Regions:
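Conserved proline-anchored active-site loop of SAM-dependent methyltransferases
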Residues: 70, 82-101, 105-112, 118, ...
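Conserved phosphoryl-transfer catalytic core
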Residues: 113-204, 338-347
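Short "lid" loop at the C-terminus of a central beta-strand within the Rossmann-like core
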Residues: 123, 320, 382-386
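SAM-dependent nucleic-acid methyltransferase catalytic core
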Residues: 179-315, 320
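SAM-dependent methyltransferase catalytic-core segment centered on the flexible catalytic loop
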Residues: 295-313, 318-376
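Class I S-adenosyl-L-methionine
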Residues: 395-399, 403, 410-478
Length: 478
């Protein structure tokens, strides 16, 4: 096994900033002064965009790393049967990839939309369950389609009027029950028949049922986009454009969405999601604050009869001020019955540096009780330079500050930093025009050991050769 290279600053080698070239044609990346380099080549960047399990692209989600990056660390630092934890699971990339590789993936998030995506991936409905439920929904729609079509016409013609109110999401109620109003921009986005079907499905799907939850998650992934596989062409698939933009664009262009059948489009989405067999291992999804995830994870693991300590953490803490997960998913959250403003208020992601560092210290302190003695903790931390054109003070060199003020005081052992430049042309935010790629230009991957034993394991695993075939050869017998 090739021994890893650890470059530590010294009087002979230290410069204002250590530098190295990652690959031919790429800019040299900078290491924060004082942090050693962990020589893990970013091979994940050479993989196909949709590398990994077919459940990964269930729905786009901003500020998420690719499945290949998760694999690079899961393959190095865990074995089949180990628990792999992500306390900021987002769309569930780490726990799903862990389950796909025979580990026990555990994801936690405070965002109910992220929780739904994670739960749908680590505890998915079977193809038979999903398709049977979809067929039943189609039959139920056919029975009462006239009532839902009339409701959709009222929603479009008389927005906000009590006569155009709709049933609550997940209530199972019919088109003549009026619980809540519909945002004007929702009516602008869809063809009347498509809107009618969405209103029906929104009422029918119960998110506490695993099969309905899986269908709802798949539906969020086809809600809007620029091809015939999406229910509306008003917006890109990556995120929901601002409501004001939607109103102005629809008025300026006289936008009319083509008619798309919800059941047909969702059926095709299921075909894509089930292109590969379901993961060999089931995982766990938790809804709650990352600062108290450890006890909840251990309790859930024990109840499931699984090991109650994680051997690996792979996570990306929320970026400073950059992403409002409710706001950028307002149409998806409406479909699910969630309040986008309440999500953003709960997440409170607009941290300045010092409160952000204190928050991460609380998270790392809490995690200690769920980690094995030789656990490895991988933190993907982006340098945040701008937020909608405004320079963010203290956003560059964040990994060093996380180590100094959040990880080191809690007894973690530093293995080093791996670097990953963020190519603007490949980011979801490339649609933001001049702002594209400027918010986060470099991800610094901070690799820690829970103890000195974990640090030594992190160093030893850095030089391992990783199998990038999918599924990996070692897993084909699982």
């Amino acid at each position: 096994m090739a021994r890893p290279t650890v470059i530590a600053p010294s009087e002979a080698t230290a410069t204002p900033r250590s530098r190295r070239s990652v690959a031919s044609g790429q800019l040299a990346l900078e290491l924060p002064l004082g942090l050693p380099e962990l020589a893990i080549a970013p091979e994940w960047k050479a993989q196909q965009r949709l590398w990994g399990h077919s459940l990964h692209p269930m729905c786009s989600y901003l500020a998420s790393f690719p499945a290949a990056l998760a694999h690079a660390f899961i393959a190095r630092y865990s074995r089949p049967g180990d628990v792999v934890l992500d306390p900021f699971s987002g769309r569930g990339t780490t726990p799903l990839q862990a389950c796909a590789e025979g580990r026990i993936g555990v994801g936690n998030d405070l965002n109910p939309f992220a929780y739904l995506l994670t739960a749908s991936k680590v505890d998915p409905a079977s193809p038979a369950e999903s398709r049977t439920r979809l067929a039943a929904l189609r039959l139920a729609w056919n029975v009462d389609s006239a009532g839902w079509l009339a409701l959709a016409e009222r929603v479009i013609a008389r927005p906000g009027h009590p006569a155009s109110w709709i049933p609550e999401a997940g209530s199972g109620r019919g088109p003549h029950d009026h619980d809540e109003s519909v945002p004007d921009e929702v009516a602008l986005a869809f063809h009347p028949r498509t809107l009618a079907q969405l209103l029906f499905v929104r009422s029918a799907l119960r998110l506490d049922d695993p099969t309905d939850r899986f269908l709802a998650a798949g539906l969020t992934g086809i809600l809007h986009g620029k091809s015939a596989s999406y229910l509306s062409e008003l917006m890109p698939n990556t995120f929901s454009m601002a409501p004001r933009y939607v109103r102005e664009f629809a008025a300026r262009t006289e936008f009319h969405s083509p008619s798309r059948d919800v059941f047909d489009c969702l059926g095709l989405k299921l075909d894509r999601l089930y292109r590969q067999p379901l993961p060999p291992s089931r995982g766990l999804a938790l809804l709650g604050d990352a600062r108290d995830a450890a006890d909840r994870a251990r309790c859930a693991l024990r109840e499931a009869g699984r090991p109650d300590r994680a051997r690996l953490v792979v996570t990306s803490p929320p970026y400073l001020r950059v992403v409002k997960y409710g706001y950028y998913n307002w149409l998806r959250t409406w479909l699910l019955g969630f309040d986008a403003r309440a999500i953003d208020a709960t997440l409170d992601d607009a941290h300045h540096r010092e409160p952000y560092l204190a928050f991460l210290r609380d998270v790392l302190a809490d995690l200690r009780s769920v980690l094995t003695d030789d656990a490895v903790v991988v933190l993907v931390i982006g340098d945040v330079e701008t937020d909608r054109g405004r320079t963010i003070r203290g956003g560059v060199g964040l990994a060093e500050r996380v180590w100094e003020t959040a990880a080191a005081p809690e007894g973690y052992a530093l293995a080093g930093v791996a670097l990953d430049d963020v190519a603007a042309g490949r980011k979801m935010t490339k649609l933001w025009g001049d702002e594209a790629g400027r918010a986060t230009k470099t991800d610094r991957i901070l690799v820690l050991g829970a103890t000195e034993s974990g640090r030594r394991r992190a160093l030893a695993g850095a030089g391992l050769d990783i199998d990038w075939t999918w599924p990996p050869r070692a897993l084909r017998a699982i």
